[in-house]
Amino acid sequence: MCTLANRSFAKMNGIGNEIVVLDLRDDPVAVTAAAARAIASQVPYDQLMVLQPPRAAGTAAFIRIYNNDGSESNACGNGMRCVAKQVFSGTDASALAFESRAGLLQCWRGAAPDIYTVDMGVPKFGWQDIPLAEEFRDTRMIELQIGPIDAPLLHTPSAVSMGNPHAIFWVDDVHAHDLGRFGPLLENHPIFPERANITLAHIVDRTHIVIRTWERGVGLTKACGSAACATAVAAVRLKRAERQVQISLPGGDLTIDWREADDHVLMTGGASFEFEGTLDPALFAGAA
């Protein structure tokens, strides 16, 4: 039987992003895609954050990130704030470092309770890095549309990698389009060989942007931290926003600061604890 049986987990929330944190640092075991899907059947989540023993010196853990369809992701900003809250609760440190498949991540306690800042790293804009299936010299706006050629419903998104691929469509009203219908079509468009997170973004002013996101491997979500980061940097590249902006998502607000000194993207927002539980052994009979 899979040794995940009876392991403790924490159910958490990152401004509407449903997160499960599974701390395996003291007794590590591999988590398969089937096991990740099985866990989602007991406690529904958007992302499963698995803490494994640290690999790099000075880090608190190596983080594996799973979507609820069992696929693995390189980045989840809202999930990282939840991880930070859990790990900070056992220490008086003001800063912690973690490692993921995307590299090293720094986290800090915020000025207010349950507020945390995560360094999401440096965004990538090269078509090979996002990645895209075709060469685009300028990924600030790529050739992609939904709808008739002469009257497209959505068109010319910005493309960005924040450790995972994002496409941001600029619209006047994020609620005027059926993202539940178009999201899966765009997520799986051939232009995105690794699929993509699809975001609708409305620029209110140079310091405030409203977004909705269809999250790769998840679907419609109340919050996607990496999408907020991708939107902020894409707007700056288009000269339509300042380097520090407020991003409003259905689940709440995030502050994104694209630091000019080193191009790192800092994301600040809330994380909350909901409940603890143990994994049902019956889930893993066929998921080992």
Curated annotation (Swiss-Prot):
Stated EC number for the protein is 5.1.1.7
The UniProt annotation places substrate binding at N17, Q47, N67, G77, N78, N164, N197, E215, R216, G225, S226
Q: Please verify whether the record's keywords include Phosphoprotein.
A: no
Pfam families recorded: DAP_epimerase
Picking any one GO molecular function of the record gives:
diaminopimelate epimerase activity
Q: Does the keyword Cytoplasm apply?
A: yes
Task: Please give the superkingdom of this protein's source.
Answer: Bacteria
Q: Which UniProt keywords apply?
A: Amino-acid biosynthesis, Cytoplasm, Isomerase, Lysine biosynthesis
Q: Which InterPro entries match?
A: DAP_epimerase_AS (IPR018510), DAP_epimerase_DapF (IPR001653)
The Gene Ontology biological process terms listed for this entry are: lysine biosynthetic process via diaminopimelate
Recorded catalytic reaction(s): these are: (2S,6S)-2,6-diaminopimelate = meso-2,6-diaminopimelate
Name the residues annotated as site: Could be important to modulate the pK values of the two catalytic cysteine residues.
H166, E215
| Active site: residue positions | C76, C224
Compartments annotated for it: namely: Cytoplasm
Q: What pathway is this protein a component of?
A: Amino-acid biosynthesis; L-lysine biosynthesis via DAP pathway; DL-2,6-diaminopimelate from LL-2,6-diaminopimelate: step 1/1
Q: Which GO terms describe its cellular component?
A: cytosol
What the record says about family reads: Belongs to the diaminopimelate epimerase family.
SUBUNIT field: Homodimer.
- What job does this protein perform? Catalyzes the stereoinversion of LL-2,6-diaminopimelate (L,L-DAP) to meso-diaminopimelate (meso-DAP), a precursor of L-lysine and an essential component of the bacterial peptidoglycan.
Q: What is this protein called?
A: Diaminopimelate epimerase
The primary gene name is dapF
